[in-house]
Amino acid sequence: NQASVVANQLIPINTALTLVMMRSEVVTPVGIPAEDIPRLVSMQVNRAVPLGTTLMPDMVKGYPPA
């Protein structure tokens, strides 16, 4: 099973992502792959992301589609 990126804390809208905000976890449905965590650093979320929420490609501004 592939690990996805999950919010490690509440991430407010328009916040630039940092490593501390994200963790990898095997979840369903699958979100952004965990190996993309380094690419996500400094990208902004376009909505508030609650703790434990899987990051989906449409939540991150400028994240390339799969």
UniProtKB/Swiss-Prot annotation:
Transmembrane segments: none annotated. Keywords: Antifreeze protein, Secreted. Gene3D superfamilies: Antifreeze-like/N-acetylneuraminic acid synthase C-terminal domain. Signal peptide: none annotated. The keyword Secreted applies. It comes from the Eukaryota. InterPro entries: AFP_Neu5c_C (IPR006190), AFP_Neu5c_C_sf (IPR036732), Antifreeze_III (IPR006013). Detected in blood serum (at protein level). Residues 4-63 form the AFP-like domain. GO terms for cellular component: extracellular region. The keyword Heme does not apply. It is found in: Secreted. Its main location: secreted. The record marks Q9, N14, T18, Q44 as: Important for ice-binding. Belongs to the type-III AFP family. Contributes to protect fish blood from freezing at subzero sea water temperatures. Lowers the blood freezing point. Binds to nascent ice crystals and prevents further growth. This is Type-3 ice-structuring protein HPLC 12.
